[in-house]
Amino acid sequence: MGNIFSPTHLIIILLLILLLFGRGRVAELMGDVAKGIKAFKKNMKEEEESIEDKVEMADTSQVINEESQQSQPLSVKRAAIRRKASSDSKGGKASIAKKQRVK
């Protein structure tokens, strides 16, 4: 008993399907199958583009975060210097006043 999927068996099966359903019905079914495949490919392409967009957005936001982190220390340093200068000037006056009271 040979292979069930030999070319002659497939031809006989296809002829039986054609006889049972008719040409129009088979053509309609094949059209529906083609539409389904086309819709599937379209959705796969949209999903891939969506993933690429998300990756691109993540890369962009990472670059922006890195740039802001690089520029942030300068402003933080300036603020720290200002705080230190203001606390030194206030603290300096207070310590001088304390020293004078002690004497």
UniProtKB/Swiss-Prot annotation:
Compartment(s) of residence: Cell inner membrane
Q: Which domain of life is it from?
A: Bacteria
Task: Please give the InterPro entries that the UniProt record associates with this protein.
Answer: TatA/B/E, TatA/E
One record GO biological process: protein transport by the Tat complex
Q: GO terms for molecular function, please?
A: protein transmembrane transporter activity
- According to its UniProt entry, this protein's organism is Bartonella tribocorum (strain CIP 105476 / IBS 506)
What's the name of the protein? Sec-independent protein translocase protein TatA
Give the compositionally biased regions (Polar residues): 59-74
Can you tell me where the transmembrane regions are? Answer: 1-21
The UniProt entry's GO CC annotations, sorted and at most eight, read: TAT protein transport complex
Q: Which Pfam families match?
A: TatA_B_E
> Can you state the subunit structure given in the record?
The Tat system comprises two distinct complexes: a TatABC complex, containing multiple copies of TatA, TatB and TatC subunits, and a separate TatA complex, containing only TatA subunits. Substrates initially bind to the TatABC complex, which probably triggers association of the separate TatA complex to form the active translocon.
The UniProt entry's coiled-coil ranges are none
Q: What does this protein do?
A: Part of the twin-arginine translocation (Tat) system that transports large folded proteins containing a characteristic twin-arginine motif in their signal peptide across membranes. TatA could form the protein-conducting channel of the Tat system.
Family affiliation:
Belongs to the TatA/E family.
Q: Which UniProt keywords apply?
A: Cell inner membrane, Cell membrane, Membrane, Protein transport, Translocation, Transmembrane, Transmembrane helix, Transport
**Region described as Disordered: spans on this chain:** 48-103
Protein topology in the membrane: Single-pass membrane protein
